[in-house]
């Protein structure tokens, strides 16, 4: 039978600590040559919505150790509104019932069957933050106690969980442009983690004196400036442009979860003039590619760092930077397999016939 799991099931089955451990193992597999990642692919078309475009995304990866291959797909309607003076990338819940469409398909490389279909919402935010946690665990100072968090959305919340899972944080200072939102975020995360979470009036105030600086926003531009960065800080971002050029220049070394050149992604779009100026992943990746070329002498892969092929932090005064990048298929494969195994053991989820997803005729 093929198991169908939703976001609520994933939240019930997956802790941040276990997510981080699963991702660590996956990145070690990658470094040992027993994992495979296909480039992320984004395809764009116009839609009937005048201020939005259609986007279809796929990411794939497999792990020989677990005997699985995962594919994550998203069918999205994307807009770029100006919010609080900043251009944001916002997905619209345009599916029937005001819902989003994002799915993870997990296949067995032994029996070939489709093991599970998982909605990707909660697993997505966990694997992004979990990778952030892996980087902080191995690169941030051991005595890190204070974190600055720029962002107060769904991805920022799990970033807080991840940092608290790998360092005994006592305080998180959070900034986002909307005062009510950052206050509500601080109250919620403080209750969840049992630590002090303080809303900051501006990003500079949040960063001042922090041991870890994490960016987790949907801004299309830089939100942290190098002038605010102090010796000993560990910086971590989801997209490379969240930290400005000076942050990268000041960093003693940079850890990246995946390739920062053009091998990590591909974009496709129709020739419709309405798509001429949209912000594709290629446009966002231009920043990452440029910084890779400029700073490649001090960039190492997370997989190499975990295997001891490159040194970790050697000095408490070093400034380190973790570039999360655009995601890898092995992240979905490792975490989805963990969730699937636990769901099977607990009898959670809905089963449907596996035969619905196979055929007797030659494909």
Predicted stretch roles:
Residues 1-125, 131-133, 143, 329-333, ...:
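N-terminal ligand-binding/catalytic initiation module
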Residues 151-153:
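Glycine-rich Rossmann-fold phosphate-binding loop(s) that bind the pyrophosphate
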Residues 156-157:
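N-terminal Rossmann-fold NAD(P) dinucleotide-binding loop
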Residues 7-10, 248-363:
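Adenosine-phosphate binding glycine-rich loop
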Residues 146, 170-171, 196, 253:
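Residues at the starts of beta-strands that form the adenosine-phosphate
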Residues 166-190:
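NAD(P)-binding Rossmann-fold cofactor-contacting core
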Residues 140-146, 168, 230-231:
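Short helix-loop-beta connector
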Residues 194-285:
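Rossmann-like adenosine-cofactor binding region
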